[in-house]
Design a protein with these regions (language model features):
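Amphipathic alpha-helical "coupling" segments that flank catalytic cores
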Residues: 1-180
Length: 180
């Protein structure tokens, strides 16, 4: 079983296709990039070509690279906002498995929700939304979060952030209701 549907199989040796079939899919030398940024198929000749062309087509094939980009990008966004990231390597790894081209973004939520215990807010953001939490200079939970988009938005992420803030408001309102 595959986490995502299997669409193609690249099977090459010495720049030639090694024919095989699996799950009704024949091997070849074609793949595709990011479904929004570079959806057109292209051929590859070897692993270096595969890695390079996919990177050019906005797909980071190495999960460790995606984890590093998420962690460093989130930490930088937090620092730029005068905040600190709540470390959560497990969540970073999970999110790295959900995206091909990670783009960390900083969002915010209404301060009124800070009346709900921090553990409830962090759990709601983590479990339901896959958001990283942030702390202020005093070590208290900040009314902000980091989400990770799977694309570079033309508007710099404004619509993505607004949409995530909207959804989080509903989630936190539910948490607030059940807590009080």
């Amino acid at each position: 079983r595959w986490v995502r549907p299997l669409h193609s199989i690249i099977s090459l040796f010495d720049n030639s296709v090694v024919p095989l079939s699996f799950a009704g899919i024949d091997s070849g030398d074609q793949t595709r990039g990011h479904r929004f940024h570079a959806p057109e198929p292209f051929a590859v000749t070897d692993f270096a070509d595969y890695r390079g062309k996919l990177a050019g087509a906005k797909v980071m094939i190495d999960a460790a690279d995606r984890r590093q980009l998420i962690a460093s990008g989130a930490a930088q966004l937090a620092q730029d906002a005068g905040l600190s990231l709540v470390a959560d390597d497990g969540l970073v790894a999970e999110v790295a498995g959900l995206v091909e081209w990670p783009v960390p973004m900083l969002g915010a939520f209404d301060r009124r929700f800070l009346d709900v215990p921090a553990e409830v807010l962090v759990t709601t953001m983590k479990v339901n939304q896959k958001y990283l939490s942030l702390r202020d200079g005093s070590g208290n939970l900040a009314p902000n979060f980091i989400t990770v988009a799977n694309l570079e938005a033309r508007d710099g992420g404004g619509q993505i952030i607004a949409g995530n803030e909207y959804v989080l408001t509903a989630r936190l309102a539910d948490a607030e209701f059940f807590w009080t």
